[in-house]
């Protein structure tokens, strides 16, 4: 099952537990401090939909700081509710990782005191994809057609909240999908009028499936914009590293490096905040 790492990580961060307060046996934590001034150890969720993009960003950050980036694949395959993620993340950040990539950055999300969040390095939207050449926005999709949504995603929550504010006969029927491949198939065969999903997922589908290239994005109106701001985690004990990474991100946004990486991967949205 494919998940968006940012959503899983946000679930984990909402737990708000520090290393010492987690359910992990204390003997599993290595409390010695790593001393390696010439390298940056970067970890990833191996099931992340933006895994390769995040690594490209990490390598650009490393180059900007004159540090060798060393990759640790990390972990993945957690359920949608994020169970187990915070423990694995805590162990990794304490024992082996300098930075964990692909985190949804939100000023309103409570963060564990064990972690510090960098500036966003990219802001990437949820999009509406349809297989109809005449529709220009979601408002053109008839209400008697069903919409697919990426299960437990920000885009799905956005539609739920909008529907709740409308009369029943003005709501779209929602079908949540854990598998974006199947959801795309249902849009293509007409079972669904359209689908709401994170844009990098659509970009990946269109790279991997020739038939998915027929899908086109339309404006999300009347829904408000759903934008995921993607950043990284560092240990809250390493304020120097966070400051250096933030400065590197600012420089890479300013000189167009991150925008170029987004273009390379076919991501829409914009670099930085």
What is each stretch, according to the model?
Residues 1-9:
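Bacterial N-terminal signal peptides that target proteins for export
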Residues 16-20:
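Sec/Tat signal peptide C-region and signal peptidase I cleavage site
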Residues 21-103, 264:
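Extracytoplasmic small-molecule ligand-binding "clamshell" domains
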Residues 21-24, 55-64, 132-136, 142-154, ...:
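Extended ligand-binding regions for polar small-molecule ligands
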Residues 39, 120-129, 200, 207-250, ...:
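Periplasmic-binding protein-like
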Residues 46-65, 124-179, 200-201:
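Bilobed "Venus flytrap"/periplasmic-binding protein-like clamshell domains
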Residues 59, 68-142, 219-225:
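Acidic, polar ligand-binding/catalytic clefts
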Residues 93, 101-112, 160-161, 189, ...:
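A ligand-binding cleft/hinge motif common to bilobed small-molecule-binding domains
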């Amino acid at each position: 099952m494919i998940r968006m790492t940012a959503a899983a990580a946000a679930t984990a961060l909402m737990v708000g537990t520090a290393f010492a307060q987690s359910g992990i046996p204390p003997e599993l934590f290595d409390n010695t401090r790593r001393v390696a001034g010439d390298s940056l150890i970067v970890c990833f969720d191996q099931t992340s939909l933006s895994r390769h993009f995040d690594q490209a960003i990490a390598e650009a950050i490393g180059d900007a700081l004159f540090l060798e980036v060393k990759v640790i694949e990390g972990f993945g395959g957690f359920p949608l509710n994020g169970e187990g993620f915070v423990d694995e993340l805590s162990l990794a950040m304490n024992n082996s990782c300098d930075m964990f990539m692909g985190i949804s950055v939100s000023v309103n999300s409570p963060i564990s005191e064990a972690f510090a969040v960098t500036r966003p390095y990219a802001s990437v939207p949820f999009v509406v994809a349809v297989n109809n050449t005449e529709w220009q926005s979601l408002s053109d999709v008839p209400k008697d057609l069903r919409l697919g949504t990426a299960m437990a995603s920000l885009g799905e929550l956005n539609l739920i909240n909008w529907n709740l504010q409308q009369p029943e006969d003005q709501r779209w029927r929602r079908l949540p999908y854990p598998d974006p491949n199947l959801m795309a198939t249902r849009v293509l065969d007409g079972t669904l009028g359209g689908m709401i999903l994170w844009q990098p997922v659509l970009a990946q589908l269109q790279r991997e499936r020739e038939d998915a290239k027929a899908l086109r994005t339309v404006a999300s109106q009347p829904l408000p914009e759903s934008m995921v701001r993607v950043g990284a985690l560092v240990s809250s004990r390493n304020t120097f590293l966070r400051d250096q990474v933030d400065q590197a991100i600012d420089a890479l946004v300013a000189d167009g490096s991150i925008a170029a990486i987004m273009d390379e991967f076919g991501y829409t949205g914009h670099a930085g905040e």
